[in-house]
From Swiss-Prot:
SUPFAM superfamilies: Thioredoxin-like. [2Fe-2S] cluster binds at C21. Belongs to the glutaredoxin family. CC-type subfamily. PANTHER family: GLUTAREDOXIN. It holds the Pfam family Glutaredoxin. Signal peptide: none annotated. The gene is GRXS5. Keywords: 2Fe-2S, Cytoplasm, Iron, Iron-sulfur, Metal-binding, Nucleus, Redox-active center. May only reduce GSH-thiol disulfides, but not protein disulfides. The keyword Iron-sulfur applies. It comes from Arabidopsis thaliana. This is Monothiol glutaredoxin-S5.
Length: 102
């Protein structure tokens, strides 16, 4: 859990993902299309990927990827991110976190 806390506090937008997950790809593309430069951790490529997945599960994230943190706060998975986007709450959240300026 300590590694997870350090990872999410380093940048304004952090995405935990897996290369094999199509929803992870969709969420990463959404943020990149906004012009946001998220820190992306591919859990199937890093040594502590399983440990991070377990920590995400302990936070209640199911499925464990994709998971998005904005401003150090858990936003959730693809469903939560898309809901925020559709109700026009995502961009203001990104601006408040300093991840988006326009």
């Amino acid at each position: 859990m300590e590694n997870l806390q350090k990872m999410i506090s380093e940048k304004s937008v952090v995405i935990f993902s897996k290369n094999s997950c199509c929803m992870s790809h969709t969420i990463k593309t959404l943020f990149l299309d906004f012009g946001v430069n998220p820190t992306i951790y591919e859990l199937d490529e890093i040594n502590i990927g399983r440990e991070i997945e377990q920590a995400l599960a302990q936070l209640g994230c199911s499925p464990t990827v994709p998971v998005v943190f904005i401003g150090g706060q858990l936003v959730g998975g693809a469903n939560q991110v898309m809901s925020l986007h559709l109700n026009r709450s995502l961009v203001p959240m990104l601006k408040r976190a300093g991840a988006l300026w326009l």
